[in-house]
Swiss-Prot record:
One of its GO terms (molecular function) is metal ion binding. This is Coenzyme F420:L-glutamate ligase. Coiled coil: none annotated. The keyword Oxidoreductase does not apply. Pfam families: F420_ligase. It catalyses: oxidized coenzyme F420-0 + GTP + L-glutamate = oxidized coenzyme F420-1 + GDP + phosphate + H(+); oxidized coenzyme F420-1 + GTP + L-glutamate = oxidized coenzyme F420-2 + GDP + phosphate + H(+). A divalent metal cation 1 binds at D115, D155. Belongs to the CofE family. Catalyzes the GTP-dependent successive addition of two or more gamma-linked L-glutamates to the L-lactyl phosphodiester of 7,8-didemethyl-8-hydroxy-5-deazariboflavin (F420-0) to form coenzyme F420-0-glutamyl-glutamate (F420-2) or polyglutamated F420 derivatives. Binds 2 divalent metal cations per subunit. The ions could be magnesium and/or manganese. Monovalent cation. The ion could be potassium. The gene is cofE. A divalent metal cation 2 binds at S156, Q213. GTP binds at residues 15-18, 45-46, 50, 118, 211-218.
């Protein structure tokens, strides 16, 4: 016999293009949708950065000598390389046509997460403080609607031992980020000793399937009826400390 246990809904929403010059906030925009308690709102980081006017015009950037030299190796414009360096704590790996850095947030990713896609002009870094941004959006939504929701800001990142980019949570508020399941029992009564689930990353990846990573134009996703804890989780709790990273 097969029994239906869980049914989760994933709703992709098209919204107006965000420039940062709107006379409404993201919370006000999102609140126009009929939200329900325990909805999880996943927002593409591009939208958040643009709404926060975190876009740098190329003609305002003066590349350093380091950026100019690196640009020749990477095949990127010196201005783009300068922003990559400015957004990083350190360079983790450097090779022909690629640079992997640790960002100021602690993320290890290509190009410090710096992007030019889906931006009509300028260079777009990641949001300055994604957890803070997620929290402000969540609080704004709850004040307007009275609904208890979670917010995740997601981005696409590559994975070191697998091909293809995948959605990850860079900012989290109101929903679990890292789900510690140690002490729970499995189906056969054995106690879980080490299990920690990156549940916010799993939700971010789920949303990315609907968002797409090209010209789909769906930067906002509602995940409804997700069987996950709602608490004061953050994106930071998903970052492995450098001293715990056996590959660096």
């Amino acid at each position: 016999m097969i029994t239906e246990r869980v049914k989760m809904e994933v709703i992709g929403l098209e919204i107006p293009l965000i420039s940062g010059n709107e006379d409404y906030t993201l919370a006000e925009l999102i609140s126009k949708y009929p939200l329900k308690d325990k909805d999880i709102i996943v927002i593409a980081e591009t939208v958040v950065s643009k709404s926060e006017k975190n876009v740098i015009l190329k003609d305002t950037i003066k590349p350093s000598n380091e950026a100019i030299e690196l640009s020749k190796k990477l095949g990127k414009e010196p201005e783009v390389v300068q922003v990559i360096l400015d957004e990083s704590n350190e360079t983790v790996r450097l090779g022909p046509n690629f640079i992997v850095t640790e960002t100021k947030h602690g993320f290890v990713c290509a190009n410090s997460g710096v992007d030019e896609s889906n931006t009509s002009k300028g260079i777009k870094p990641l949001p300055k403080n994604p957890d803070k941004s997620a929290n402000e959006i969540r609080k704004g939504i709850e004040e307007i609607t009275g609904k208890n929701v979670g917010v995740i800001i997601n981005d696409s990142m590559g994975r070191p031992f697998r091909k293809g980019s995948c959605g990850v949570a860079i900012g989290v508020s109101g929903v679990c980020g890292l789900w510690d399941r140690k002490g729970e029992k499995d189906l056969f009564g054995r106690e879980l000793k080490t299990t920690e689930v990156g549940i916010a990353d799993e939700l971010a990846a789920t949303a990315s399937v609907v968002m797409g990573q090209s010209n789909e134009g769906i930067p906002l996703v509602i995940i409804r009826n997700a069987p996950v804890p709602f608490n004061d989780g953050t994106g930071k709790e998903l970052i492995r400390k450098k001293e715990e990273d056996v590959f660096r």
